[in-house]
Each structure stands twice: as structure tokens, then as C-alpha cells.
UniProtKB/Swiss-Prot annotation:
This is Protein LOL2. Residues 138-149 have a biased composition (Polar residues). Residues 98-128 are annotated as: Putative zinc finger 2. It is found in: Nucleus. GO terms for cellular component: nucleus. One of its GO terms (biological process) is response to bacterium. Residues 60-90 are annotated as: Putative zinc finger 1. PANTHER family: PROTEIN LOL2, PROTEIN LSD1. Its main location: nucleus. It comes from Arabidopsis thaliana. Keywords: Acetylation, Nucleus. It holds the Pfam family zf-LSD1. The modification N-acetylmethionine is found at residue 1.
Length: 155
């Protein structure tokens, strides 16, 4: 009887140890949120005055081929998708126009100067004319505020 109790206790202890060893990671597909870049202060022995270095800000876009969300350094002209290897052209806000699809009325974005745009939803082609153009995205949103100007406004 005593042997059975000892064996049961050993099995329970082994089971507890196995549970403690198992680490549950994040669920599949989970990615951490992108945080704004920190401002780094560098102090050198030669220069006792600290120097503030601004780390480049990140931006996001959707891959034109596989529709994955891509993060890149602001100011980049091209971004290569790590999933499908497509090189995407990065357009600034003042280089992008918007128009509603003639067929399904989906809001489409296109590079300024394009004569027409194909809808990614219904595949119809919408001609870009003066009567169906919207103002550039940058004009709709107003001037772009940098992260540093937002920090100054908070203080």
C-alpha cells in the first residue's frame, strides 16, 4: 500500500514538473505591436554634452501582390515583401490619387498621372477623369505631423 502511495506521489510530482517546463507562447499569427522609435541619447567621454539621435520612423503599406502588411523605414522608395519577394514601389501621400470604382464603388488608390485603374475586387477598369478624382490623400488629412512634433505638443 505504501509503495502505491509513493508511486502516485512521484507521478504527481513528475506531472507538475512537466507542466512547469511547458511554456505557452503567443498564438499562431500573433505579432507584437509596432511601437514608435525611441529617442536615443549618446554621451561620449570626449563630448560631455549629450547628443540626441533620432532613429528613423517606420511606416506601413500593403504588398501589392499578396496583400500582407509590410513595415519599412519612412523615406524608402522600394520595399521588398518577405513573403512573396515582390518589390513594391512606395508612393508618398502627395503622389497618390483616389477614385471610386465605376462598377462596385470600392474606393481605389492609384499613382497620380495614371490614365486608368483596375479594381482589385471586381477587376473592372475605371478611367481617371477630372469629374471622378478626389483630392490627394495628403490634402484630405492635412499636413503630416512628425513624431517629434507630437512629442513637443504633449510637453
Amino acid at each position: 500500500m505504501e509503495e502505491i502511495q509513493q508511486q502516485t506521489q512521484k507521478e504527481e510530482q513528475k506531472h507538475r514538473e512537466e507542466e512547469e517546463e511547458e511554456e505557452e507562447g503567443p498564438p499562431p499569427g500573433w505579432e507584437s505591436a509596432v511601437l514608435p522609435p525611441p529617442i536615443v541619447t549618446i554621451t561620449a567621454a570626449v563630448n560631455p554634452n549629450p547628443t540626441t539621435v533620432e532613429i528613423p520612423e517606420k511606416a506601413q503599406m500593403v504588398c501589392g501582390s499578396c496583400r500582407r502588411l509590410l513595415s519599412y523605414l519612412r523615406g524608402s522608395k522600394h520595399v521588398k515583401c518577405s513573403s512573396c519577394q515582390t518589390v513594391n514601389l512606395v508612393l508618398e501621400a502627395n503622389q497618390v490619387g483616389q477614385v471610386n470604382c465605376n462598377n462596385c464603388k470600392l474606393l481605389l488608390m492609384y499613382p497620380y498621372g495614371a490614365p486608368a485603374v483596375r479594381c482589385s475586387s471586381c477587376n473592372s477598369v475605371t478611367d481617371i477623369s477630372e469629374n471622378n478624382k478626389r483630392p490627394p490623400w495628403s490634402e484630405q488629412q492635412g499636413p503630416l505631423k512628425s513624431l517629434s512634433s507630437l512629442r513637443r505638443a504633449e510637453n
